């Protein structure tokens, strides 16, 4: 799951748009067009029933640099960050590079699947040094698509303990029939105002080389991330 290198060609609509850009012949500084933001808003609203605002979206070059910037904005050196191991290894370096301590909430492997140890999560989230949870939804590498009930329980624990949820949702389009991806921030106003979501078309649409990703948050602005 961690390698965004597909065995199929990128969609013709993408390759045709790239050809048009190449034919333009000038590759100086560019501004992200409004049409990009409208496409993101439309996609999540139509496909995932998540109503987001244009102002919530920050364009970025990748989810990994986005995670690092968010951790820097929401923590101080020596703060603690929760992760649900086993998990994408770049989570660890993003935490460490910001001078924070990684705290593991290990997933429980049982009956050929993984589940969250909520008792352990409750205990560790209560530590006042824990400032945020890096959530992977759907989870990489476990392959779990967290249910609404699981996400609500995570959110309630984090709200009670004033822990931010930073949700990496890059795999949201890679969901098998019979399972439903739910954006964490879509579940309540409280969750939306205490979370940051990271998305990208790179995994599902074979676009990793184009370096396109989004930070989506009603609570954290571009100004916060630059501070």
Question: What are the functions of these language-model segments?
Answer:
Residues 169:
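Walker B catalytic acidic pair
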Residues 137, 165-166:
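Residue-level marker for buried hydrophobic side chains located in beta-strands
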Residues 1-28:
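N-terminal "arm"/small-domain region of PLP-dependent enzymes with the aminotransferase-like
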Residues 223-227:
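Conserved small/polar residues in nucleotide/adenosyl-binding loops
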Residues 27-156, 173-174, 181-192, 196:
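Conserved core of the PLP fold type I
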């Amino acid at each position: 799951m961690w390698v965004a290198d597909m065995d199929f060609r990128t969609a013709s609509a993408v390759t045709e748009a790239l050809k048009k850009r190449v034919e333009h012949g000038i590759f100086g500084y560019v501004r992200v067009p409004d049409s990009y933001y409208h496409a993101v808003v439309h996609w999540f609203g139509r496909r995932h029933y998540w109503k987001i605002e244009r102002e919530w979206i920050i364009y970025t070059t990748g989810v990994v640099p986005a995670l690092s910037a968010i951790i820097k904005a929401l923590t101080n050196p020596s703060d603690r960050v929760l992760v649900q191991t086993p998990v994408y290894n770049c989570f660890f370096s993003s935490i460490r590079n910001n001078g924070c301590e990684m705290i593991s909430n290990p997933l429980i492997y049982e009956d050929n699947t993984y589940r969250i140890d909520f008792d352990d999560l409750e205990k560790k989230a209560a530590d006042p040094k824990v400032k945020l949870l890096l959530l992977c939804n759907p989870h990489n590498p476990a392959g779990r698509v967290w249910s609404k009930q699981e996400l609500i329980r995570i959110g309630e624990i984090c709200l009670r303990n004033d822990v931010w949820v930073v949700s990496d949702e890059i795999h949201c389009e890679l969901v098998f029939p019979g399972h439903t991806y739910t954006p964490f921030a879509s579940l309540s106003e409280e969750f939306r105002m205490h979370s940051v979501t990271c998305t990208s078309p790179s995994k599902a649409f074979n676009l990793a080389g184009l370096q396109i990703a989004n930070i989506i948050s009603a609570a954290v602005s571009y100004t916060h991330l630059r501070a």
